[in-house]
Amino acid sequence: SKIAQEVEPIVNPNTLEKPNLTIGYVPVNDCAPFAVAWEKGFFRKYGLNVKLTREASWATSRDGIIFGRTDAAPVVSGAVTNARIGAEGARHAPLCAAMTIHRHGNAMTMNRAMWEAGLRPWREYNGNLEEFGRDFRRYFDGLPSEQRVWAVVLSSSIYEYFVRYLSAAAGVDPLKEFRVIIIPPPQMVTNMRIGAMQAYMVAEPWNTRAITGNEGVGFTFAQGKEIWLGHPDRLLGVMESFIEENPKTYRSLVKAMIEACRYCGDPNNQVEVAKIITGRSYTAAKPKKCRAPVVINEDNIQSLPKCITKFTGPGIIGEYNYGGFDQQKRIAKSLDTTIFFDMPANIPQEPGEHSTFLWRSRSVWLMTQAARWGQIAQIPGNAEELAAKGWRADLYREIAAELGIKSPKEDYKVEPPEVFIDHKGFDPSDPVGYLKSFEIRANRPSQFFMA
């Protein structure tokens, strides 16, 4: 972009092992830091010449890194862990990540039939999992088995785990009561319209697009933060060999992305960021009735009408509409709808914590879920070693410190009960005990009673 070209590099590209990079992204709201790093010149500032490539799905975003088509790309938070442990037949690959792209920014959408059956947004159940479970089971019990379908963006993603976690917390066994299928984000709304699934979980703007006043095919049941407050979503994925062979380049990449995340998280920039990602090169989520230029660039971004952010704005700006089919307004204003850097005060946090910091303990949590749902036979005995190899909090600390950013001193933390929908906390020092505490899980030993 013109703005990027005017940025004076503070790192000489000739000092980098690989200054020319190909970086993937997926057309969802969390492409924002990649778009901003490119449009605002953060890549150029750190000596990088980046070509962005739009990926069709989270599978191609991950596989592009593994097969060397891209140098880096966002991956779902479970991708690095699952490539290390081979969850559900995943290709074993030494994927790494030193930073989170964002936290939150995703939601569960249910179709109109579920609304008409009496289901409502989670916030209207006032924390009553039993009541939700009754409504949920009643609806699915009335469907033939082939229609009991919930869609997510990738197998073994945190979205799949959230769908199963929610269902099990409400007393409905997700291994027996419905199927989980994989659909790329841009295809979710269309597939719901034709009845391919009853519900789905995806990043914005593909939940907002579904509600009344937009596509009108569904309503938002819950944001992901209502399942686990403060959870990580996307990570900046690379291969381990990339870090080893290009240490200076990698530091430049992480610095550029940290700065881009800080820019996206600044409330003063959120409307602009929401406008940028409506561009055809990014989400292409531009309302048809909003009069705006076909091409969105730095020359016209400030003058674009706010209606252009109808789809991308709620998740970025934090005025989130749950929708519904009863003409009632369900708009929740919050600072934590999508978190790119600074942590809102309502989220339990450690000194120095910001959203781009990776907690290795959360990689262990992902392993507990892979084991819980039968994607691996058991939690690996070397879980901490695998987490350390994949989630490079050590590198992040060093790189962030060079930017004057303090980070938490520890790699592990206890997740308190209040952040989970079922109020069951997670102590990473006892992952096996945590796994066994769940009544509903795969491979649970049968109990035999003898008179």
Where do the language-model regions lie?
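Secondary-structure end/capping motifs
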Residues: P247-R392
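Inter-helical turn/loop segments and adjacent helix faces that build the functional surface
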Residues: D173-F178, E244-S252
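Short, glycine-/small- and polar/acidic-enriched structural segments
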Residues: I3-I181, M197-G230, V419-D422, P428-P431, ...
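Short glycine- and hydrophobic/aromatic-rich loop-to-beta-strand nucleating segment
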Residues: M108-T109, L235-V238, F242-I243
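Solvent-exposed, acidic/flexible segments
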Residues: R54, W58, I101, S156-E160, ...
